[in-house]
Regions:
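A domain-level signal for the structural core that forms small-molecule/cofactor-binding pockets
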Residues: 2-78
Length: 78
């Protein structure tokens, strides 16, 4: 039962978020062989001024060994 959480800055349209959720769902279904009913996708908007604390330090820096795609920036770039 994959549940994918996408954290992003505010400002993307509902259409863009829906399109991304559909693309993620399609890829999860194809690659991991789950049915559509098993996949859920959430979008969490985080303000740019909160990104370092709420996302980078909490979900990236402190979980570096769990990232399958690492960012090309660090906390000093924020």
């Amino acid at each position: 039962m994959p549940h994918v959480i996408v954290k992003l800055w505010p400002g993307k349209s509902e259409q863009q978020k829906t399109q991304l959720a559909k693309a993620i769902t399609k890829d999860v279904m194809e690659i991991l062989r789950y049915g559509e009913e098993s996949v859920s996708v959430a979008m969490e908007e985080v303000k740019s001024q909160d990104w370092a604390e709420q996302v980078f330090k909490a979900d990236i820096q402190n979980k570096w060994d769990r990232l399958y795609k690492k960012p090309g920036y660090d906390v000093n770039d924020l």
